[in-house]
Amino acid sequence: MTAVRRVVSLCSGLLIGFSVHCAAAPFAVQLGDARIGLDAPSGFSDTTFTASPRLQELSESLTPASNRILLFALSDADLRRFTLGDPLDLRRYMIVVTPRGMERDRVTEGAFKQFIDESLTGLGTPPAEKDVVKYLDARPTGSANLLAELRKDPDVVSVLQGARTKASFFERSKYMLSSTTLLLLRGKALSLSIYTQYDDPSDLEWIRTTTTRWVDDLKRLNSPR
């Protein structure tokens, strides 16, 4: 490798590392008269700083246009792939949004309860079947199915859902897990979603643990100093 190529390679590595470090740092968003601190879980980085049309399109596909996207995070490995122009794995990712119609108003506990009821209506009850693959195989392809209620407090509700993709001729069905958390934070209603491909029970444990830890971390980040 020539000296010039070594310098270019070194600079590229430093740039990638700097970008990932910056994206992984906590940041604040202004919602009406409140500043909300946000941060992605460990091992993930926000991508909104990239202003990438490709990533913006991907994030917008996850939520209705009536929501404002505050954070869209990829794994650190995927962010490095994106920086290098390589294909993304997209095995795990997450998003935080807030309803545009509520972002400037202070949300009371009553209004937040109504927001929960409207957002989670029709989910049904969690199944008795604990085998995720067995249960999803019995459900319609592509439908989101409630798997469990993870948390239910006055200021935070979390649910776990799963879906199955249709198998192709040469491939078996794929399974996807997602958690949705509705969180009242500093008088603002936030919706947090985490997505992971399901290959084995460790993915189920990962999304449960990450959902709980992320909510607790955000509440701690926004607690009065």
Features from the language model and the residues they span:
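Proline-anchored loop/turn motifs at beta-strand termini and strand-loop-strand connectors
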Residues: 34-52
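Boundary at the C-terminal end of the N-terminal hydrophobic targeting segment
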Residues: 22-26
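Short, well-structured beta-strand
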Residues: 148-222
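N-terminal secretory signal peptides that target proteins for export/translocation
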Residues: 1-6
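Conserved polar/disulfide-associated segments of primarily extracytoplasmic proteins
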Residues: 54-175
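Short acidic-hydrophobic surface loop/beta-edge motif
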Residues: 27-31, 160-163
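Bacterial N-terminal signal peptides
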Residues: 9-21
